Amino acid sequence: MKVMIIAPYIYDDNIIEFTKNKTGFGIMVQNIVSSVAELENVVLLTRVITKGKNEKNFKILSHTWGQFFSNAKLKDWLIGIKAFFANGVTVKDKARHVFYEVDGGYVRKQIQKEKPDIVHIHGIGTITESYIRICEEMKVRYTVTLHGLIGLNDSVSAPAYEKQIERDFLIKAEKNNIPISVISSGMKARIEEKYLGKKANNITVITNGTKKSDENDTKFIREEGTLTQEKFQEYYSDCLKQNDLYPKLSDTYAYLQYSKKNGKKILFFVGNITKNKNQMQAVEILKNTKVFENILLVLWGREVDNGEVRKKIAEYQLHKNVILGGFNDRMDIFWKFCDVNLFLSLNDGFGLPIVEGYMHGVPCVTFEDLDATQDLYYPEAMLKVKDRSNESVTDTLKIALDKNWKYEEIIEIGNMFSIDKIGRASCRERVFWVVV
């Protein structure tokens, strides 16, 4: 079966044009593409301008400005012009929406050329609307995967029109039996309750997965004593004074190695730093240094919060307890330092960092009411926080740090969510919809 996977972008550190968007979504889609390509004939189409590339098992289709202009039809331009004059949109967004709609001509041409059995679209919004439009125009079978919900989450920063697109499409999809997959049971339940008011037979839960790298850490190991605790803390204090400046990964690695050796308990919190990911609450909790004197928290991810968390770390003088680590594409060699994976997101479809931690034997503390918790909760690997107060998080975290976790059991749970298993489930779902 030939599958055309369509996504706004992926993250791949080996291809320069795919390194701009350093997000969990980009990593997840790249993992899914690689996994499905082990089983099916896969081509990948994105919004990114690229010359394309033949990867080991799949092909990234070229997407150049020449292809953009030469394949656009009059109707694509007319729809683009209509999008430009939409209400409540900034000029920058207007230009972006015109690009998305006019780019429909390129998408049409690629579908004609590649002749996929099914098109698999990732995400709902203005950035993917023209993908759906072209599939329906050409009467090509398509399925859509949602990696999160924006319309039901006040903490997710998105324009009202984007949230309305999500709502309208999910209602349309249920009415027309368009196959949808979501990444957690909690997401499906909320769609049924808040959008549809009934059970949705067209929605399937296929949890996301991840893969564990065999990468070694040889290049990160340095001679003992070359970066003392005092030197790192002084160096990190200087980093805190400048926006988007982080310690080198090799220096953070050395400091974590030193801290672990000297009895520190280490927490990781993985995800771009945003209001929704809620790293600020973790910082507020660590402010109580009497309780967490021997704790080191590392926040891994890009800052998308205008430096608010950075300012709080400086204000509370927590440079000895909270490290802004920046985006880390070598996480696999860092997990061994982590005692507990802290995940305090306000809303999250799946909680990929939870699974990444599991695969390395790292237990998690997270909120009971997250969409992700229903599928990822195993008492051998997770403690659930009953409510969102700082006191409840503090109490649960203290229990987690004192608990005698069985790391091999946690790894076994993590292996249940390997990207290969998820890829096979995804392929079975596509085959079903193609046959139907």
Predicted feature descriptions by range:
Residues 1-53, 59:
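N-terminal subdomain of nucleotide-sugar transferases
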Residues 31-32, 150, 160-180:
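Membrane-proximal helix-turn-helix segments that form the acceptor-binding/catalytic region
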Residues 346:
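Aromatic "clamp/platform" in nucleotide-sugar-dependent glycosyltransferases that forms part
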Residues 210, 270-274, 295-310:
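Glycosyltransferase donor-sugar binding loop
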Residues 50, 172-244:
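A short, active-site helix/loop in glycosyltransferases that binds the activated sugar's phosphate group
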